[in-house]
Amino acid sequence: MIMGVQAQGITQERYSLIPRVLVFPVDEKGQVLLLKGASNKKIWANLWNGPGGHLEAGESIVAGAKRELLEETGLSAGKLIHCGQIVVDTGINPGIIFFVFKAKELSGVVRSSVEGELSWFSQPQALKLKLVEDLYTLLPLVMRHRANEKPFWGHYSYDENDQLVMRFSR
């Protein structure tokens, strides 16, 4: 049976997801490299987050994670560990799905970009920063994730007061 685009049943009415990647570079001392969003950014200005962004058309998830890491930090990863994926139900179509990675065996020279400034932190230090809201929960999950473990599944939604609701499972 032919599985062309028309056979997929894809229409504007169907719920769709925008793919993104989020990468947490971790050095040999166990410190994580975070990015403080530039003050002129539309979203997450002056908040700390992992490097990441949208996939380009035709780009694989892994290629997108490697590209975003290099563009935003100047680093390449010898080892990219898939920690999980999270669907974000924004209440409108499309939603978001982001794929979360831990980057290890790093090479290159750390350099800030137009996205913001970079700095290394221990996990306890990082959790005291002004982080993007979900990182207080997400960062510990990523930091304790091991390469041989199953990735986690996450679902984010917003309640009637526009407050973030997070659920995770394995």
Q: What spans do the regions from the language model cover?
A:
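Charged phosphate-binding loop/patch that engages nucleotide di/tri-phosphates or the phosphate backbone
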Residues: R144-R170
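Conserved N-terminal beta-strand and adjoining loop/helix that marks the start
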Residues: A7-L33
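Short Pro/Gly-enriched beta-strand edge/turn motifs at strand-loop
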Residues: I2-G9, C83
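A short coil-to-beta-strand element that immediately follows conserved catalytic motifs
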Residues: L75-G84, F152
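Unchanged
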Residues: L55-G78, V88-V142, L164-R170
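Short, solvent-exposed loop/turn elements at beta->coil junctions and helix N-caps
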Residues: T11, C83-T90
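A conserved beta-turn-beta hairpin within the catalytic core of GNAT-like acetyltransferases
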Residues: K42-N46, I97
